[in-house]
Amino acid sequence: MGWRIELSRRAEKQLAAIDAPEALRIVRYLSELEKLESPRSRGKGLTADLSGLWRYSVGDWRVLCRIEDGRLLVLVVEIGHRSTVYN
């Protein structure tokens, strides 16, 4: 059984606001995560105020996720440009 990717409402809106080619690139990246044994193998754990979240870099975009091991779920909570996503 593989991992499941879900987007929060906020992340869905943010993805819809991104140019189509970049949004497609992000969606393809997320679909690759579903196939991995551990989604942590490609991401980076965040610290300080964002501890508990994982970051994935897709070009100039950052995808911030919460990983729930018990449910095999990667919940995308924020998608944004690298210059503003951490604000």
Question: Where do the language-model regions lie?
Answer:
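Enriched for short, Lys/Arg-rich terminal
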Residues: 1-9, 13, 17, 21-24, ...
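A short, surface-exposed loop/turn module that caps and links secondary-structure elements
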Residues: 31-57
